[in-house]
Amino acid sequence: MDARHIMTVAAAALLLSCGSGADEAARAVDALPPIYPDYAGVTVPCNIAPLNFKIRGAERIRAEFVAGGEARFVADGRKGAIEIPPKKWRALLADADVAEVRVSAWSAAEPEGVRYAPFRIIVSPEPIDERIAYRLIEPGYEGWLQMGIYQRDLTNFDEDVLVDNSVNSTGCVNCHSFRDYSPDEMLFHARGKSGGTVFVRDGRMKKVDLASTPPLRQGVYPMWNPRGRYVAFSTNDTAQSFFGGHGQPVEVYDQSSDLMIYDTETGRMLTDERFFSDARWETFPAWSPDGATLYFCSAEPRSMPLDRESVRYDLLRAEFDFATGALGERVDTLYDSRTAGGSVSFPRVSPDGRYLMYTRADYGTFPVWHAEADLAVMDLCDGSEVDASALNSDEAESCHAWSSSGRWVVFASRREDGRYTRLYLASVSPDGEFGKPFLLPQRNPDQNAWRLKSYNVPEFVRGEVRLPRGELKALFK
């Protein structure tokens, strides 16, 4: 098991009647505890925040954490929730001499208590990147009150705002990208009054109005080349329509889209007539880890929104010349929607360059509203499809990212309720096998349910991002 440590969780419910002092549940059942979030059988990094959980409807639960056959600590929780002591949790995960780790829990479900069957948590020796960044926004259609880009420390529960729309008079703040997981080099868009694209490099910030740079088109979906200097953008004319008597009430779609490459050293926007014309719609650029190949999605134009269900995006790639900023003559089609069916969006290549993860829906370019949208993975060595079924659900899976080690992925999913996108983490083995996804840990397990905002565009970052807020505000005066 690659020197992983196996944590087995034995959970039992204990509902105390008035005046009862019993600590041992009276009845044992051969069933896993109905904990929320579901952490049974997941593989977690050795530096992850505590996996606090609850049993809904319980008044008290008690969890015993056992490692190597001996009890390490016990955590008691009122109102049905367990808050694991962080120091004890870290010590448990760091115990490299333990071949097997078992966790036992007693939860409150009946007056006399119930002891549940144990469940396992597998602890990987592979750490996860310290931070993730994401946007939080109400899942509305046209309007919003507040949105922002945030960072979360995955080793604890700290969350900080990087930038929100108070800096640009409540305009849209979106589409962040980091250069090669660096907390010191990033960009984001801020629309509205005095808007522009903000580039951050080593503590210095610069706002650029891409729409005033020939060819006078605004950048939308970005990805910074891992080697620096260049940023690939798609420029999208996006709209949405609402439909009655249809299983899907709204469709977000492009009416045109092209590719552009911005040279951060010269301030020039580079275009290629093959990918900047009315002949095709190109979107979602993504670089290979060495920065020498650009992947992107491409579709034949249709009359929108009437022909929305016939729009299907292929997955293409082209070589990139870093010296000139030009794309090569050869263009490969990796996924042909005419023969394979479906529509591709959000391509992302693993750090070792072997795998490419993408989102596949029946049609279109905005899978967030498509319940059938799933994550798919391609082996770039031979073009075969890798089994990613462990990651998917009956609701929409959408944007995603690889960790810098390639051993973890984060992705957005609506599996909880079909309305809000929340973030899930999953392990990746060296041979491309995905572990059971688990919900982003929170100090209070209910936070995942009562936070009425959607997460999108999760990105791993190697360390803390520091943006001087005063300087940010000054950019938009």
Where are these regions (language model features)?
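Bacterial N-terminal signal peptides that target proteins for export
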Residues: 1-7
